[in-house]
Amino acid sequence: MWGETFDDFENDEGEMAMAKQNLIAEPARADFTFAKLPLGIQPVDFMKTHFAETAGKSMQFRKGTTTLAFVYEPATPADKGGIIVAVDSRASSGEYISSKSVMKILDIGDRMVATMAGGAADCQFWTRIVAKYCTLYELREKTSITVSAASKYFANTLYGYRGQGLSVGSMVAGYDKKGPQIFKVDSEGDRCQLKVCSVGSGSLNAYGILDNHYKPKMTDDEARKLGLRAIMHATYRDSGSGGVCNLCHITPTEKIRLPPMDVSKLWYEFADELGRDITYNPVE
Amino acid sequence: MSIMSYTGGTVVAMAGDECVCIASDLRIGEQMTTIATDQKKVHKVTDKVYVGLAGFQSDARTVLEKIMFRKNLYELRENRNIKPQVLSEMISNLAYQHRFGSYFTEPLVAGLDDTNKPYICCMDTIGCVSAPRDFVAVGTGQEYLLGVCENFWRENMKPDELFEATAQSILSCLERDAASGWGAVVYTITKDKVNVSTIKARMD
C-alpha cells in the first residue's frame, strides 16, 4: 500500500477511481479516544482533587506565561514588516519554577506559529494536531492553509472539549495570501482576529508597554525592540513569567527566529539607559 | 494561594566560627504581582542580634514592633543587651500567645551571644523553636534553601567564607522560587562589626 502512486492504476479505470477515493480522501476530524474515568466521576472534579494547589508540586501542571504578538507595516522601504511574536520562557507550578527554558513559540507550518499559554501539555498536544491537519491540508489542496482556517480548526477542536478542563490560550500567527494575521484562540472556544494581542498571567503588564509604544508603521528594529521590551517589563512585574525572551519575526518572505535574550540582562541594560540607581541601600 | 506565600519572601541564616550570616531577598508582592523590590526581611535588634521575619509581611511588621517592645522592656529592666537565646525564647512565647489565631509569619533569629558563640534558630508560626548548629531557613524558598545549604555549609567557616556560602545559597534559591527574588541583602555579623552587602540578582 505504502509507496503506491496513481501510475500503478493507470490501466484500469475502475481501479483508478477506487485509488482516488482511497488516496485523496479528506482526513477525518481528529477524534481521539482518551482514557475515560470510571462512571460517575466528573473529569473536572477529579482533576481538582488530585492536581490542584493542594496537591504536591509534581502533580500540578505547568503554567504562568507572558506571550504577545502584533502586526505592523514597514516604515521604510528597507524594512520588511510582518508579525512579531515574543514570549518568555518560564514554566511554574504555583511558586515553584519548574523550567527556565521553555520554547513557547510552536511551529505550525513554514509560515505559521502558535504561542503557548495555559496548560503546557494541552498547548503542545493540540498545536501538534493542528500542525498535522495543516500539513495534510497542504498536501491535499496543493496550496498552503490560511491562518484563518488553521485557527478555526484549532478553535473548533478546543470547543469540542469545552468544560472538560482543557487550559489553552494560544495565538496563531502567520502570513498567508491575505497578508499577516493573528488569531487568538482559547479553550473556552473563543477565536478572534487582532492586530495587537497578549496572553498569559503577565499579559496586562505587556499590554501596558504595547499600547503605549505600538504604531501601525514601524521599522523592523523598532518592532523587535518593542516586543522584547514588553516581555521584559512583564517578566519584571509578573512572578509567573521570566527566563529568556524568545522572539520570532514573520516577514512576507520568511520566518526568522531570533536568538534568546536573557530578560534579567535586558532589565539591567534598561535601568542603565534610564540612569536609574538601582542599588539597594538598607537603612537601620 | 496560601496566606504564607501571599507576599512571598525568604530568609536564611548560617553559623560560622565566631560569626553568623543572615540574608533575605528584597521582593514584596501581592500573589503573582511584584509590588516593591526594596523590602528586606532582616531587622536589627541589637548590635549582634538580628531577626528575620518571612511570611505575610503585614503580620511580620506587627510582630517586629511587638518584638522590639518586649526587647526594649527587657533591656531596661535588666540593664544589659539581650542574648540571641533569650530573644528567641521571647519571640517563641509571643508567638505561642497567639496559638489559636496565629500571626502568619515565621521568625528567625541569628546573632552572637556574650561569648561570641554563634546562635541561629527558626520557628514556625506558633513558636516551635529549632536551633540547629549549621543553618536555618524560612519563607517561600525554604525547601530550596535547605537543599543548597546542605552542600555549601562547612564546619567553622570564617566570615568571608560564610558570606560566600550564604550569598550563593540564597541566589540559588531565588533561581527556583518565583515568590522571592529581585535582589538580596546579606548581613555578616562578627564580634566587632557587621558587614552589610546587597547582591544583584535576576530581576524576573
Curated annotation (Swiss-Prot), chain A:
The active site is at T65. Residues 1-64 form a propeptide. Disruption phenotype: No visible phenotype. Constitutive skn-1-dependent expression of the proteasomal subunit rpt-3. Double knockout with ddi-1, sel-1, sel-9, png-1 or skn-1a results in failed expression of the proteasomal subunit rpt-3. Its main location: cytoplasm. Its EC number is 3.4.25.1. It catalyses: Cleavage of peptide bonds with very broad specificity. InterPro entries: Ntn_hydrolases_N (IPR029055), Pept_T1A_subB (IPR000243), Proteasome_sua/b (IPR001353), Proteasome_suB-type (IPR023333). Keywords: Cytoplasm, Hydrolase, Nucleus, Protease, Proteasome, Threonine protease, Zymogen. GO terms for biological process: proteasome-mediated ubiquitin-dependent protein catabolic process. Component of the 20S core proteasome complex involved in the proteolytic degradation of most intracellular proteins. This complex plays numerous essential roles within the cell by associating with different regulatory particles. Associated with two 19S regulatory particles, forms the 26S proteasome and thus participates in the ATP-dependent degradation of ubiquitinated proteins. Belongs to the peptidase T1B family. This is Proteasome subunit pbs-5. It comes from Caenorhabditis elegans.
Curated annotation (Swiss-Prot), chain B:
Its main location: cytoplasm. InterPro entries: Ntn_hydrolases_N, Proteasome_beta_3, Proteasome_bsu_CS, Proteasome_sua/b, Proteasome_suB-type. One of its GO terms (biological process) is proteasome-mediated ubiquitin-dependent protein catabolic process. GO terms for cellular component: cytosol; nucleus; proteasome core complex, beta-subunit complex. Transmembrane segments: none annotated. PANTHER family: METALLOPROTEASE TLDD, PROTEASOME SUBUNIT BETA TYPE-3. The 26S proteasome consists of a 20S proteasome core and two 19S regulatory subunits. The 20S proteasome core is composed of 28 subunits that are arranged in four stacked rings, resulting in a barrel-shaped structure. The two end rings are each formed by seven alpha subunits, and the two central rings are each formed by seven beta subunits. The catalytic chamber with the active sites is on the inside of the barrel. This is Proteasome subunit beta type-3. The gene is pbs-3.
